[in-house]
Amino acid sequence: MVVVAAAPNPADGTPKVLLLSGQPASAAGAPAGQALPLMVPAQRGASPEAASGGLPQARKRQRLTHLSPEEKALRRKLKNRVAAQTARDRKKARMSELEQQVVDLEEENQKLLLENQLLREKTHGLVVENQELRQRLGMDALVAEEEAEAKGNEVRPVAGSAESAALRLRAPLQQVQAQLSPLQNISPWILAVLTLQIQSLISCWAFWTTWTQSCSSNALPQSLPAWRSSQRSTQKDPVPYQPPFLCQWGRHQPSWKPLMN
């Protein structure tokens, strides 16, 4: 057991008293259960700034030459116990902080899930309402289109009106019908002109192919006699072939090396 008694006034030079007791004391020769008083001298030469409560100076490491091995072991054990307890306290505080963070995050997650569910329900209701409005506006657009065709050339509604919005929100089937309507309005005489142009192109192409074939067949017999005459002239007067000049190999050559038998 270690008991530390601090001095009442740190400015005084009174020493501190350490009472050490335990099993090592009996091993050293002292009676068991008897405390060993130890006088530790206080810090001498303290500056007036430290005595008056000013900035503390850097404390030098105290030498333990005046302590016995048993006292040093007890001091080391005490320091280890204090350090372990401090580490446990820090770990416990950290774990409590993390647990509180987990609880807060779970509460926030539950709030977000509830808000997400409400937003999904609201979105579903808006989608259903949007589909109903699209259907209503599509029927109104058909009625307005029929009225516009019956009246003829009238002033079209300005952009941003209810009728223009209805025309933009028509069903896909109505859009397909609107795309096919220009093809149905083509007059028959335009189709007739297109067919006549296609027929004229076909006839021109047929005439061109027959004319080129006839020209090629007429030019072939005229070119055959000329080709045959040129072949005969080359056969009658052939160009004399002169063999290349071959330099003889002998002693006059610089690389002449006869074989020695």
UniProtKB/Swiss-Prot annotation:
The record's note on its domains: Isoform 1 and isoform 2 N-terminus domains are necessary for nuclear localization targeting. Isoform 1 C-terminus domain confers localization to the cytoplasm and is sufficient to impose rapid degradation. Isoform 1 transmembrane signal-anchor domain is necessary for its own mRNA to be recruited to the endoplasmic reticulum (ER) which will undergo unconventional ERN1-dependent splicing in response to ER stress. Isoform 1 N-terminus and C-terminus regions are necessary for DNA-binding and weak transcriptional activity, respectively.
Positions of post-translational Phosphoserine modification: 47, 68
Recorded superkingdom: Eukaryota
Region (Leucine-zipper) residue spans: 98-133
Domain bZIP: 70-133
Listed name of the protein: X-box-binding protein 1
Region annotation Nuclear localization signal (NLS): where it falls in the sequence: 75-92
Native source species: Homo sapiens (Human)
Lumenal side: 204-261
